[in-house]
């Protein structure tokens, strides 16, 4: 799979390839570049250092070309910041202003109790997990040391992420469902991007356990991905939340978009001996609570 990923990057960034992707026309390519850049931050050894020199140059040029896209005043700022962070880690010329602007705005948009506004206002959706908090963490963890003003933000950013991860775990019902609220719910279990990331980083908030989170996320994946109609006859994901529900699609949703659900698989980066994989199956918060078990009260931060 690692080899296939590198081959995909080679084909997608080679201007002479029939598979060359659009990195700068329209607005949506900035989103695609942001997630590609985030992959580079998470697996630089496999997805950057093992690329051939020409592919590295093509990839850098492709990411740089996305700078012509002006991001809206919302979560999209993190796509631009993530692209610049990946360029910095790759040893390319990078734009510190794009990173600083995104970080500063998200500090201003923090609303309390682990939640950021998607822009100045609160939106009841999962974009704190789809985009904002995972990218903010990855940017600060990778590039924060370049600026004391950035580095000092990481502890609070991590504390907020832990709180949001705790809320996410509580949203998972005993049956493995979660509220279908807000836009982009066709990203399915990608709604738990942040919870999966915190498991990968070993930063799950107390009293959550790694095995309990694994059990909860497994229940969600089974409930969503085993639903009839989830995949089309060719094996590709179909637009929907639980099955094929095309009216849930939006103008920016394509077949490729749906694979944001794969972020729930981030703990695959943990070794088999890690407690996330080796621990016995455990009930998660809602399952324990609805069974009548006693437990600690939940509190804001």
Describe these PLM feature segments.
Residues 6-158, 170-193, 202:
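Aromatic-lined, polymer-binding surfaces characteristic
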Residues 25, 118, 239, 278-279:
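Generic structural "secondary-structure junction" signal
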Residues 99-102, 202-205, 278-288:
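Short secondary-structure transition/capping segments
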Residues 122-239, 246-273:
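Long, repeat-rich segments with strong aromatic
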Residues 191, 244, 284-288:
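Short amphipathic alpha-helical patches
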Residues 266-301:
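Extended hydrophobic packing segments that form well-structured cores
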